Amino acid sequence: MSGRSASPSRPARTGVVSVDLVLVTYRDRELHVYAEPVKKARGLTLPWGIPAKGDALDGVAVRIARRAMGSVPKWMEQVGAFADRSMHPAESNLSVCYAGVMPWTDSEFWREHHAVSALGERQRRMVTASLATIRTQLEQAPIAFSFLDRDFTLSELQQTYETVLARRLHKARFRRALQAAFLVEPTGNWRSEGRGRPAQLYRYAPRKRKRVRRGVRLDLL
């Protein structure tokens, strides 16, 4: 969802609060952020909306996601509030930011996360904070699986972790940590990948335990 563009010379409206959504996906070892062109102006904008009186902010974020993508992110969390005097498409002086993670979809508005300099200053800070939140929550929540389709290979899962963490992981240690977390199960199907042997497909299927870690333990990597 995008709103009308703000005039560069018009100050933020006091008391106006926007909800901004940083949608993040994964493709070809890169994180991508959803950003739309600003109407009647140069630049980009994150999807945003203005809550009506009595609206729950979580619900507003869900509505924004549905309007932008037609679906709700598999994982979504409030990142924080951002306030400054910089221009915002809603002309708001305060923005509540949510981060959402979803699998890749064919949309012209996905952009590599380091190529969103055309966003306004406040929204650029939201992207930076959202990516940091995703990294810090990677161990505590099944975020990495939210980037992937229902069925995936272990190599795809490892590449997703490597992309989010921005570092290479040892294959054997990663798979031991994944096995110790009881998070995946084989589907019984295989996928051909290049000239090598077909790769086994897995799905996210966490085993119920009294003390559950919902992500792969990063200290084991």
Task: List the predicted regions and their residue ranges.
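N-terminal strand-loop-strand
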Residues: 2, 6-44
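Short, well-ordered beta-strand micro-motif
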Residues: 23-25, 99-101, 201-203
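Active-site segment of metal-dependent pyrophosphate-handling enzymes
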Residues: 15-19, 58-62, 66-107, 135-144, ...
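Long, intrinsically disordered, low-complexity Ser/Thr/Pro-rich regulatory/activation regions
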Residues: 186-221
